[in-house]
Amino acid sequence: MNDDKTERPVKTANQRGAARLAAVQALYQMDVGGTGVLEIVAEYEAHRLGQELDGATYLKADAGWFRSIVSGVVRDQTRLDPLIAAALQDDWALSRLDSTVRAILRAGVFEITDRKDVPVAVIVTEYVEIAQAFFDDDEPKLVNAVLDRIAKQVRGETKK
């Protein structure tokens, strides 16, 4: 084990993963706090992405990826929400979902619909892992099922 405190570069994939997590947190904060997109992006870029906050150091994130997800979800929410609602079970309304789950699904669906350069398997896996970071129960399974359904509908493929 190396005790060397030198900073190692963070791989691009990890920076995108960190950006996805930060985007979900920002979308959640916007949903429950009514914060605007410009304000939230500025706050995260100045004080959170790759920064230390309350003794915890945030992983360096791809700021462009973060901005793309947050602004894309806000811009396209009226297109994304019906896709999510249609992929839920008949007795579930999008408004019944936990705010964190809504943020995860919106970000994941945005990437599925708008980031065709990213494989479905990567998108679904990343957002299921984010769900697992917040929930122990059925929520990660729900995220997996909904994103898989939407990927099949939009791209004609599912996570393999």
UniProtKB/Swiss-Prot annotation:
GO biological process: DNA-templated transcription termination; transcription antitermination
Record keyword Transcription regulation present: yes
GO cellular component, one term: cytosol
Pfam family, one: NusB
GO function terms (MF aspect): RNA binding
Domain of life: Bacteria
Keywords tagged on the record: RNA-binding, Transcription, Transcription antitermination, Transcription regulation
Keyword Transcription: yes
Task of the protein: Involved in transcription antitermination. Required for transcription of ribosomal RNA (rRNA) genes. Binds specifically to the boxA antiterminator sequence of the ribosomal RNA (rrn) operons.
Similarity comment: Belongs to the NusB family.
Listed PANTHER family: ANTITERMINATION NUSB DOMAIN-CONTAINING PROTEIN, N UTILIZATION SUBSTANCE PROTEIN B-RELATED
Record protein name field: Transcription antitermination protein NusB
Annotated source species: Rhizobium leguminosarum bv. trifolii (strain WSM2304)
UniProt lineage: Bacteria, Pseudomonadati, Pseudomonadota, Alphaproteobacteria, Hyphomicrobiales
